[in-house]
Design a protein with these regions (language model features):
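N-terminal Rossmann-like NAD(P)+-binding subdomain of aldehyde/semialdehyde dehydrogenases
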Residues: 1-120
Length: 120
């Protein structure tokens, strides 16, 4: 089973409940199994997010902008894997929809947010 990311750490979910994504074109279950987080995981994630938001509020705008640009670059570096998985989970065509529209829109929004942070 996949782990949950809470407070920067991948860990086992508190609950043993899980689900699998299904390819809507074939109705076949995809191989990965994902946890259904319970309230303990949700509370821990929310507490970590609150703490991170407070820390992030004190960062200079350029640091936030640099992070957003690096995030966009990371998505682009892994674009083939992201598009492939999104295709399996949604049955949307890899091209043009996912690779040529959705992924560039996502990275474009991240870069626009980075530019806005730099501009103040």
């Amino acid at each position: 089973m996949q782990k949950v990311l809470i407070n920067g750490q991948w860990r086992d979910a508190s609950s043993s409940s899980s689900f699998q994504a299904h390819n809507p074109a074939t109705c076949e279950a995809l191989p990965d199994e994902y946890p259904v987080s319970d309230w303990n995981d949700c509370d821990a994630a929310l507490a970590a997010a609150e703490s991170a938001a407070a820390a992030m509020a004190s960062l200079p705008a350029t640091a936030v902008a640099d992070f957003l640009d690096r995030y966009a670059e990371g998505i682009e570096q892994h674009s083939e894997a992201i598009v492939s998985l999104a295709n399996l989970e949604t049955a949307l065509p890899s091209s043009p929809r996912l690779a040529d529209i959705e992924l560039p829109r996502t990275t474009g929004q991240l870069r626009a947010a980075a530019a806005a942070a730099r501009e103040g």
